[in-house]
Amino acid sequence: MSECTCHKNYTLDTLIPKVGVITKITQETPDVKTFCVTAPGGGKMFDHMPGQCAMVCVPGVGEAMFSITSSPTNKEYQEFSIKKCGVLTDCLHSLEVGDEITVRGPYGNNFPVDTELKGKNLLFIAGGIGLAPLRSVINYVLDNRDDYGTVDILYGSRSADDLVKLKEIQEVWAKTPGVNVHLTIDRPQEGWDGHVGFVPTYLKEIGFSTDKTALVCGPPIMIKFVLAGLEELGFNRSQCYTTLELRMKCGIGKCGRCNIGSKYVCKDG
């Protein structure tokens, strides 16, 4: 087996579960809730960077890796937008404000917001719950607005009811100078007067210029066709970033669950 040459991006502290108190729960869509979590005495449980994730656990039920959807600039709490799709997430969706969970992390590489992305025009492309990891980056960029160029956000879902953080998108992001928001849903829906069509198709219809760096997250099949669409528009690989945490388990390159050849999603990704 080829030796992994990834850097050590964790410490002992990231391996120790920390108690988190649920202080707010927002019903985003019929099957997605956002959980606001703090340390028992208030404040964030740990520091993180945009794009990183954490292992969320309900003791006695199980644990899984979820993206941290809040920005590092938020010093009061961390947020996780979680889709109900299994035993653990069913249990998480049954919890109430005041309940406790455990969280360990952060894990995974972050988007290079302070290096490669700084000063660049940014294009965020998300599908469904894939907005959650990108929201951390988007809000970080908006909180440090002078450090970045123009921002385009292309976001789509199956229906208008499945658009996560729609109020924030319309009332904050869309009203921020230099930010352009493009929303779409897969099929026509009563009451929806916006664009109708799949994200990869809408991407090519808009025809974004190649003076941008693209950050992509969503269902694997969407990512595949979005990256192909970006290539058709003239984007090269160095201009495209995507995120993947579905295969991650330990988060530190030890369990081998997320390896692709000699690379590890959690550390090389």
Where are these regions (language model features)?
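Short, structured interface segments that constitute the first stable element of a domain
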Residues: M1-T5, D211
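Local cysteine-cluster metal-coordination motifs and their immediate loop/turn environment
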Residues: S2-E3, I221, L244-G269
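Ferredoxin-reductase
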Residues: C4-D99, S157-S159
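FNR/FR-type flavoprotein reductase catalytic core
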Residues: V87-K249
